Amino acid sequence: MEEKFRNCILGLAVGDALGMPVEGLSIENIRQLYGEVRDFLPSPYGDLNAGEWTDDTEQMVVLAESILETVYFDPENFAERLKRWFLETNSRRIGPSSTKAISNLMRGVHWTRAGVFSDTCGAAMRVAPIGLVYHFSLNLVERYAEISARVTHTGTAAIGGAVAVAVAIACNVLDFSDEEMLEEVLRRVEAYDNLLAEKIRYANEISDRDVEYAVEKLGNSISSLDVVPMAFYSYFAGKDFEESLIKAVNAGGDADSIAAICGAIKGAKGFAIPERWLEGLKDREFLEELATKLYELHMRIVKLT
């Protein structure tokens, strides 16, 4: 089980770093500039080097460290940590909804009112630690995913996206089959956003089609209605970690978030991450230590319950 924690956290960061240089590009642009992205590349804007990750991984770390401090998820602690991170980060890629919500928090707005009514994917991209630590109770995973989303995002698709990703990760740690995992995800997401649930279902149905077809049908914008289904498409379409991540990255659009989410879900299933990606990943040892701490916290919680 500890390996699944490790591969989930590292998988998220690997996907983020792979998608970073092509974030915002169309499939056609990616092909013209790079052919097919299969390895880490530097940002064309000069802000990040090959193997470095973006705010997707940074916010995941913020959430993980909050959980490690509070044991059970505390939205007030998470909100305070988001404020601190926002002041300290050098990232120039923070999404519009997160930026506005954290700005609200910094102006003294309580976390219950600071969130922005938006369907962007900031809550889904960072939620992995919740699916890992609390996988012993899918109801708790769903509840914490929802609350963690509301700190910055209050749109139904944004919340549903966070629930989908967290529940998928928890199910994979629990060794659910892909069919059982999908059924559990859909059942819970339907309570938040029917369209998102239908698109995730469809993502599985078209997983034998190519990436161009998937992007045409599902989209690749920053909306959770696009990012989360595309991440599930990539998950189901690849026979292993590498194939899924290459599909996710080369989908373009919000490629780093699509690939980060796909990498987290795929890693939680236990798929091995190619060593060449791990060797080039920024702060690999820090992320491995973070995963170990999350696993140890999970074990302590289980012993107490």
Swiss-Prot record:
The keyword Hydrolase applies. It comes from the Archaea. Gene3D superfamilies: ADP-ribosylation/Crystallin J1. It holds the Pfam family ADP_ribosyl_GH. This is Uncharacterized protein AF_1724. Keywords: Hydrolase. Belongs to the ADP-ribosylglycohydrolase family. SUPFAM superfamilies: ADP-ribosylglycohydrolase (SSF101478). The keyword Hydrolase applies. GO terms for molecular function: hydrolase activity. Its EC number is 3.2.2.-.
